[in-house]
């Protein structure tokens, strides 16, 4: 039914242009629609009236290429310093429900190896229902994403 299809479809909206390059996309996920009894929908992210949306689905190639870009940026910002710890928040639906165990372990490995190599760096991971990550120099609410916060010693 239309209602069932809406419950597994991602809605994306256009991201403000100043974030396109840093984010690696001109669109940002607004989430799965919550279908109300009257068949109207509710989205998690606050959206301005009249905003246009597109329907989207997972694109594994884009997920991995985006992850590689994110890890390259993080490693560059570490500037050779070894992380003291990493806090990792992952979307519960995207990471725990949508992906199979093998793919999820591959994604986590793609994140851990560039930062930790084979060293015993503490890595605290959790699933969430919305993730905060930096975008444009400020905390930004994301949905269906991964957020990594790397703790480093200050440069002397």
Where in the sequence are the language-model features?
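Small-residue-enriched flexible segments
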Residues: 1-121, 126-156
């Amino acid at each position: 039914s239309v209602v069932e299809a809406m419950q597994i479809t991602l809605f994306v909206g256009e991201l403000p242009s100043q974030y396109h390059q840093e984010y690696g996309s001109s669109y940002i996920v607004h989430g799965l629609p919550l279908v109300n009894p009257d068949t109207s929908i509710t989205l998690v992210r606050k959206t301005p009236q009249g905003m246009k949306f597109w329907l989207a689905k997972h694109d594994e190639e884009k997920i991995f290429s985006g992850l590689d870009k994110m890890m390259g940026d993080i490693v560059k910002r570490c500037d050779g310093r070894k992380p003291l710890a990493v806090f990792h928040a992952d979307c519960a639906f995207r990471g725990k429900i949508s992906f199979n165990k093998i793919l999820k372990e591959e994604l986590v490995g793609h994140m851990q190896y560039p930062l930790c190599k084979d060293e015993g760096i503490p890595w605290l991971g959790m699933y969430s229902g919305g993730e905060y990550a930096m975008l444009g120099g400020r905390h930004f609410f994301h949905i269906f994403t991964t957020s990594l916060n790397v703790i480093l010693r200050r440069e002397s």
